[in-house]
Amino acid sequence: MAGKKGSKRASTPRDPFEKERLIREAQLVGVYGLKNKHELWVMEKIFAKDKERARILLTSTNPEDIPINGRSLLRRLMKYGILGGIDLCDKQEVVNGLNKVLDLTINHYLERRLQFRVFAAGLAKSVHHARLLIGGRCISIKDQIVDVPGFMVRADKEPLIEYNPYSRYGDKGKKKAEAKVGEE
């Protein structure tokens, strides 16, 4: 029995040949080392949903919406390190935080991908090299191998990004390779 059909992860642009958008997308794909524009469109959909949610909350007439739903949105963005330094107990700071969400750009979201975090941590020479390391299962987050370049890294897990200990870059993998050379 087949399962339910999931919702689309990405939405395609309305005008496929808009020159400014094509140039901007090509630059983002190159800077962040994305495989194709579909990966960019997935992140843009997440970004647009968060922005729309913040806009709806700010214009809501129900006074209970901002404290409850606004805090949950801001808590999630703070968890991923997209926003920071917001006191969720103060209602005015929550409103200010929702205004900050409207000021975010797609770059804030793309920088939280594992591929860019590996490059930013200095484990790879470029974002393209980072993608190869991740696909080759050479990167782990706290002893958990992650082989998805689009994995969104939480702010508390960022310092735990390291080489997989059993890969050729990790400590145990290097010892294993040295033992093989010694046997020959």
Curated annotation (Swiss-Prot):
One of its GO terms (biological process) is ribosomal small subunit biogenesis. InterPro entries: Ribosomal_uS4 (IPR022801), Ribosomal_uS4_euk/arc (IPR005710), S4_RNA-bd_sf (IPR036986). Residues 112-183 form the S4 RNA-binding domain. Keywords: Cytoplasm, Nucleus, Ribonucleoprotein, Ribosomal protein, Ribosome biogenesis, RNA-binding, rRNA processing, rRNA-binding. It is found in: Cytoplasm; Nucleus, Nucleolus. GO terms for cellular component: cytosolic small ribosomal subunit; nucleolus. Involved in nucleolar processing of pre-18S ribosomal RNA and ribosome assembly. NCBIfam families: uS4_arch (TIGR01018). Belongs to the universal ribosomal protein uS4 family. Component of the small ribosomal subunit. This is Small ribosomal subunit protein uS4. It comes from Encephalitozoon cuniculi (strain GB-M1) (Microsporidian parasite). The lineage of its organism: Eukaryota, Fungi, Fungi incertae sedis, Microsporidia, Unikaryonidae.
